[in-house]
Amino acid sequence: MAKKSMIVKALRKPKYKTRQKNRCKLCGRPKGYMRDFSMCRICFRNHASAGLIPGVSKSSW
């Protein structure tokens, strides 16, 4: 889990646009971020497996 201070810091508008770091809306994880869903890969996998994200299904071939 991300530190609470880092999550709050990421929510503030940065002075320069290049300093912005995307974070997961659910857990605050900065890495493995998926822009389309605004969450990290771990939270995405959990929500997709539970069927909480409409239109997403497990692929198999």
UniProtKB/Swiss-Prot annotation:
UniProt: Zn(2+) binding residues: 24, 27, 40, 43
Entry's Gene Ontology molecular function annotations: rRNA binding; structural constituent of ribosome; zinc ion binding
rRNA-binding recorded as keyword: yes
Protein's GO biological process: translation
Listed cofactors: Zn(2+)
Summary of subunit composition and partner proteins: Part of the 30S ribosomal subunit. Contacts proteins S3 and S10.
Protein name: Small ribosomal subunit protein uS14
Encoding gene per record: rpsZ
